Amino acid sequence: MAKVDIDIVDFEYIEEIIRNRYPELSITSIHDDPNYCNXXIVIEGPLEDLTRFMANEYCDGMDSEDAEFYMGLIEQ
């Protein structure tokens, strides 16, 4: 199992994407920050599925340096 701790802006959107496209993954922790318009979540699941989610959904449209950084947050 792998996991990643990321910041998101639209929790409902990410939750729906995971539920519909990556059912093997689960959101195991949610932390809303009242001072900012974002939430931090922990997603866990098989490494291959988590890597695919990060590459195709979370990092989509990022510069290569940014995508590389966020892909590096995946823990095994």
UniProtKB/Swiss-Prot annotation:
InterPro entries: Phage_T4_Frd3. It comes from the Viruses. This is Uncharacterized 8.8 kDa protein in frd-Gp32 intergenic region. It comes from Enterobacteria phage LZ4 (Bacteriophage LZ4). The lineage of its organism: Viruses, Duplodnaviria, Heunggongvirae, Uroviricota, Caudoviricetes. The gene is frd.3.
